[in-house]
Amino acid sequence: MNYDNYWDEDKPELNITPLVDVMLVLLAILMVTTPTLTYKEEIALPSGSKTARATQDKMIEIRMDKDAKIYIDSQTYEYNSFPDTFNLLSKKYDKDTRVSIRADKRLTYDKVIYLLKTIKEAGFLKVSLITSP
């Protein structure tokens, strides 16, 4: 009897498919959990002041009624003289101040555009229209 042939035929083969499957699952878990780890690094942040935040929160609200009268706070302005008056008034404010316009829905489109153009010409960059449902 030839023993060499016997052992050659019955050699066990190593099936690596389950091993690869397990390794791929572990790799996927590692890739998902790695970004969630937090690293603690000492970072020296600059100190800020609270006054800078308070000045940014300032806003000018301009209201225009159906008769084209313009209101800023408690002051009333006429439609035709508003550009000159607003240019003088705008010198008190920083040009980065937010300006909100609340116009009556019965106004014509031209009057609201005129108001927007006046505010933009005064140098204000952050102008928005307020609408209500």
Curated annotation (Swiss-Prot):
Cellular component aspect of the GO annotation: plasma membrane
Pfam families xrefs: ExbD
Compartments (UniProt record): Cell inner membrane
Membrane association type: Single-pass type II membrane protein
Keywords: Cell inner membrane, Cell membrane, Membrane, Protein transport, Transmembrane, Transmembrane helix, Transport
Stretches in topological domain Cytoplasmic: 1-15
InterPro entries referenced in this protein's UniProt entry, alphabetically: ExbD
GO MF, one annotated term: transmembrane transporter activity
Gene3D superfamilies assigned to the protein according to its UniProt record, in alphabetical order: 3.30.420.270
Periplasmic side: 33-133
Biological process, per Gene Ontology: protein transport
Family membership: Belongs to the ExbD/TolR family.
Protein name stated in the entry: Putative biopolymer transport protein ExbD-like 1
Species per Swiss-Prot/TrEMBL record: Helicobacter pylori (strain ATCC 700392 / 26695) (Campylobacter pylori)
Source taxonomy: Bacteria, Pseudomonadati, Campylobacterota, Epsilonproteobacteria, Campylobacterales
